[in-house]
Amino acid sequence: MQPSTENPNRIPRRQFLKRSAGASAALLGTQFLGLVSRETVAAALPDKKNIILFLTDQERPPMWWPEGWDDANLPNTKRLKERGLTFQYAFTAAAMCTASRNSLFTGLYPAQHHAAATLTEDYAQSPTEPQLDPSLPNLATCLKEAGYDVVYKGKWHMTSRVEAADGTYIDDDISRYGFDEWGAPDAGGDTRKETFGGADALHTVKNDQRFIDDAAAWLSNRLSSANDKPFCLIVSLVNPHDCLSYPNQYDEDGGYEEDRKSVV
């Protein structure tokens, strides 16, 4: 995918690296590799602004559409690009869900954090599916050392649950990794045709709506409270992972109708 030459907000790579090399490298790079102390990380943070981090699941840049298609059909994406930075040569560390998420939060390759397999959903920890080592520094532990409250809302899928009395997920399942609050249960992918769009197995809860509602409620309560500690709120959405439905006529228009009948 060639970089756009029409984006007035585009910053040359050399200039971006020069600007961000100081605090960003010290904070997120060397700390994860254990080359600087946690105290250095805490001191490197400037004014300790509040942080809200949104994650989407299995989303990639539009690559095969005509020029201008994404701006015309993805208005919210266009708005975000116009008001922020777009990294056009960014690559995921792994194709597998669990491995990629663990790399994102630790800054390590799967061969380094060792949680390289996508974890089986709805099962407790398995010896054949290595878990992320809680002793490894990650985004949450670094921010907590810097005085932040770190709250996670949404899809986790970085570790399997710790066996609770009733076998369900509990908030403590991710507190081992430095997070102050979660919002169990976890949510993976639900791609059956009757539950397109992130519904759970019982067809009772739209996961992304649940996550957004939980995050909005937490943020409203926090901002109206007397707690003036800086916070990092991570909102991890399931979609577009589950947005797999398409208009019925696409089968016929694309010549797939008979193939579809053979597998339904």
Regions inferred by a protein language model and the residue ranges of each:
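Formylglycine-dependent sulfatase
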Residues: 2-264
